Amino acid sequence: MLFRSDLKPLLKRKDIALVSLDYKVEDKIDGVYYPECAENTENYDDLAALIAELDMVIGVPTTAQHCAAALGVKTWCLVPKYHQWRYAQPVMRWYNSMWLVHQTQLDDQVYKDGKLTFTRRDRSWKEVIEYVEKKL
C-alpha cells in the first residue's frame, strides 16, 4: 500500500508542483495542492479538465490515472507487486501515454487479531519513488 507520506521526497524538488487527485483526503501534506474537483465523485468533468492541464500524472492505479492516460496526459502508474492482469506489462495496452512502474518488493505484512497490518512499509515503495524522482 502506497501512503501519501511516501511521496514526501518529491516535495523537495523545486521544479515540480504536486496536485492530489485523491478524494476524501484526511492526512494532507503541506506543499501539495488539493483541488475541490477531486472530491466530486459523481461528476468527473471538472477533474478531467484539471487533469488535461497537468504536464504529468503519477500515482497508483485509480480512475484519475486512467482518465489522464485516456486524455493523452503523460501518466506513470505505480503498480503494486501483486496486481491485476492488465498491469503486467511495462506499458498499458489501452493508452500510449501510460507507463507502468512496478513495485519489486513487498511490504512486510502481518496479520494480527485477524487484521492485516503493515510493518516497514517504506522499504518497498521507497525504491519506486527514488526511481521516479531520478526519471523526472
Which residues does each predicted region cover?
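Short catalytic helix/loop segments, enriched in acidic residues and glycine
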Residues: 5
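Short, small-residue-biased leader/transition segments that mark boundaries at the very start
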Residues: 1-2
